[in-house]
């Protein structure tokens, strides 16, 4: 078999590797091996699995360097440790989200392309976000993944360039989920009060997190919908990983609602990934993420010029652009009639 054929075959079978890792996560294998190596017999007993089948299941995990095996004893390697919930930089929640809520709908991609329908809605009777409201299990999986991703967002370099920490008095995080992002902003803007705006089903998780972060005296949760009127009087608004969930018309509605609530000296910080303006070979992961978002909820990742078009139609304009880690960007946006106020931006 030549190299090209081998690469193609490996890609074709990529789905099986994803299901292998997801199944190992669901079975609790990574947790069971996190602290110590174990014999396959003991591991099978602890997990209530057939020993022979478990050994066969573990072999590709060894070959893929997620663990090592010696004399039927298995031990996690660094790649496997990252898929355990005990790891500080764990990808477990992302893997569970992918396995439970993303992978099943990719099988509908061909039909969706032909019918111009969202793959998720070819299977389910409601939209993805309607399911979040009505099905607590789906919300838990999605919220855990988003919380872990937001906690890992590194904003230190951005804050290091800001000189306005004493001027910002009120921060409004629109669609702020459990509050992980606004917690980072309130740590820097020490004189500010915060408000997280999100739907009713998010409230309990958000209030628990705000208390955990020790900012519940400075930050409150307010039930709201970014497709409706947004509270006014914010010096700084946050919109983190929201726009990519929506097609252009809906995204313009969200931005326009925020723009209407902004004062002439207010600013909006948007956190999103940016696609290259031209197709680049090293950006395949971004293009696949773009398709994954469409598969789930009909949204899309965008280029900077596509964002600029949305802002133009919403009465907004880019003030500054800050690269963050792993393809994330922080986009500072202001109203077209922005009026400079000392200390803000």
Please describe what each predicted stretch is.
Residues 1-69, 89, 165-345:
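Alpha-helical subdomain
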Residues 2-37, 45-48, 52-169:
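Conserved Class I S-adenosyl-L-methionine-dependent methyltransferase catalytic core
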């Amino acid at each position: 078999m030549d190299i090209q054929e081998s690469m193609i075959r490996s890609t074709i079978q990529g789905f099986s590797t994803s299901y292998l890792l997801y199944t190992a996560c669901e079975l609790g294998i990574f947790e069971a091996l996190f602290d110590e190596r174990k014999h396959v017999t003991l591991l099978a007993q602890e997990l209530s699995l057939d020993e022979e089948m478990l050994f066969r299941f573990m072999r590709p995990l060894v070959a893929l360097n997620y663990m090592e095996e010696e004399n039927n004893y298995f031990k996690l390697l660094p790649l496997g440790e990252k898929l355990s919930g005990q790891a500080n930089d764990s990808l477990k929640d992302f893997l569970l989200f992918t396995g439970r809520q993303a992978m099943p709908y990719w099988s509908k991609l061909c039909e969706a392309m032909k019918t111009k329908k969202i793959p998720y809605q070819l299977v389910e009777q409601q939209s993805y976000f309607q399911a979040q409201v009505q099905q607590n299990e789906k919300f838990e999986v999605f919220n855990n993944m988003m919380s872990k991703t937001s906690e890992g967002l590194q904003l230190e370099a951005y804050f290091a360039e800001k000189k306005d920490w004493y001027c910002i008095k009120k921060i409004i995080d629109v669609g702020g989920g459990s509050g992980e992002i606004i917690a980072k902003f309130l740590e820097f803007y020490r004189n500010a009060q915060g408000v997280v705006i999100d739907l009713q089903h998010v409230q309990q998780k958000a209030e628990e997190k705000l208390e955990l972060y020790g900012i519940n005296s400075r930050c409150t949760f307010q039930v709201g919908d970014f497709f409706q009127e947004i509270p006014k009087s914010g010096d700084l608004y946050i919109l983190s990983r929201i726009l990519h969930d929506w097609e252009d018309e809906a995204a313009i509605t969200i931005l326009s609602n925020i723009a209407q609530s902004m004062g002439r000296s207010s600013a909006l910080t948007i956190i999103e990934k940016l696609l290259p303006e031209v197709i680049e070979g090293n950006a395949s992961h971004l293009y696949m993420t773009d398709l994954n978002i469409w598969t789930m909820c009909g949204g899309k990742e965008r280029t900077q010029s596509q964002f600029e078009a949305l802002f133009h139609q919403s009465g907004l304009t880019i003030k500054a652009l800050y690269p963050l880690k792993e393809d994330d960007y922080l986009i500072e946006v202001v109203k077209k009639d922005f009026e400079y106020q000392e200390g803000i931006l």
